[in-house]
Amino acid sequence: MFDRQNTLAKTDPQLWAAIQNENKRQEDHIELIASENYTSPAVMEAQGSQLTNKYAEGYPGKRYYGGCEFVDVAEQLAIDRVKALFGAEAANVQPHCGASANQAVFLAFLKPGDTFMGMSLAEGGHLTHGMALNMSGKWFNPIAYGLDKNEEIDYEQMERLAREHKPKLIIAGASAYSKKIDFERIGKLAKEVGAIFMVDMAHYAGLVAAGVYPNPVPHADIVTSTTHKSLRGPRGGIILMKAEHEKAINSAVFPGLQGGPLMHVIAGKAAAFKEAAEPGFKDYQKQVVANAKALAETLIARGLRIVSGGTDSHVMLVDLRAKKMTGKEAEHVLGEAHITCNKNGIPNDPEKPMVTSGIRLGSPAMTTRGFKEAEAVQVGNFIADVLDNPNDPENIAKVRAQVAELTKRFPVYG
């Protein structure tokens, strides 16, 4: 029998200390990594529940194990809630992550060697959309589309390539693209060339749920997403689909790609989907976009170039070449000031992927802790102050103190 008094602090103080230090870091640092956010205590409670003990291969009502009557309730809640949230005909909530969700789509509709289209990683796409080192690039034949001279998606190029190569699958979505995507236009193109149209909305899902970013569901055959990032749930994946594709996708997820689902994570997803359907979530996402715009405008005013000229969403890329600084250097020096971001390639970046000429910034996490436009402007000035004088320890210390003052006013967890 387990004694509930034997907490982690008692049984593994070394691990406990690492977790406590991470908790402190999250409170003390301004989080600007666009793919990160903070989950609610309710989501963490579900994810830390005894549902982690239960194996449940299969789907609600059709399991390969007994004793699934209560995890069936949890999974069905997640399915019903996410369908309602996005207006989807069918949903699978079992993918362990966004990459797994994307792989399931490939497994369902493509054979090795088949041609598909996705956005170039070098111009803002995601590695699962055809990167040479990824399964999608190794096993299939990717045709990449990119950006035009204004650093916006080149739809004419996309249309030309699709008509030439006749891909079996067209993917829309990105990991570092700040503008709105014309899902309707791409959906019409996919129908014209006879392709399955898949949207990876991992970055934009929370904004989509709140109606502040275009919803791809009416236009796409398949929509994949993570459940963290802007959606503010646990780390995991989902697949939304037209009803006609439900059997193929469900079979691809299980038994095609995965075995037992993570029922404690699925419970966390269900909790997050309920939160995302509440009125306050729409207000939150409106603020996410407002904060991103305020941050971008501040950085532009301070002499930094934003790729694509600004943002329509939660994310932006900052071109650092005018500062004679790499993304790697900027990530490090901003980290010293307790501002967390990630180095990121800019379109056609001359630097290596682990160096880069830019950084990616996002507003979801800082908005969760209560920042509004005034604080976003402050953060933009903090960043510019650091990048204007990155080699002065006193300057870094001054900004770090300002960050500490701001984060104390806006705790993540009260």
Curated annotation (Swiss-Prot):
(6S)-5,6,7,8-tetrahydrofolate binds at residues 121, 125-127. InterPro entries: PyrdxlP-dep_Trfase, PyrdxlP-dep_Trfase_major, PyrdxlP-dep_Trfase_small, Ser_HO-MeTrfase, Ser_HO-MeTrfase-like, Ser_HO-MeTrfase_PLP_BS, SHMT-like_dom. It comes from the Bacteria. The keyword Cytoplasm applies. It catalyses: (6R)-5,10-methylene-5,6,7,8-tetrahydrofolate + glycine + H2O = (6S)-5,6,7,8-tetrahydrofolate + L-serine. The record marks 228 as: Plays an important role in substrate specificity. PROSITE patterns: SHMT. Disulfide bonds: none annotated. Pfam families: SHMT (PF00464). GO terms for biological process: glycine biosynthetic process from serine; tetrahydrofolate interconversion. Pathway: One-carbon metabolism; tetrahydrofolate interconversion; Amino-acid biosynthesis; glycine biosynthesis; glycine from L-serine: step 1/1. CDD domains: SHMT. Its main location: cytoplasm. One of its GO terms (cellular component) is cytosol. Its cofactor is pyridoxal 5'-phosphate. Belongs to the SHMT family. Homodimer. Catalyzes the reversible interconversion of serine and glycine with tetrahydrofolate (THF) serving as the one-carbon carrier. This reaction serves as the major source of one-carbon groups required for the biosynthesis of purines, thymidylate, methionine, and other important biomolecules. Also exhibits THF-independent aldolase activity toward beta-hydroxyamino acids, producing glycine and aldehydes, via a retro-aldol mechanism. This is Serine hydroxymethyltransferase. It comes from Polynucleobacter asymbioticus (strain DSM 18221 / CIP 109841 / QLW-P1DMWA-1) (Polynucleobacter necessarius subsp. asymbioticus). The gene is glyA.
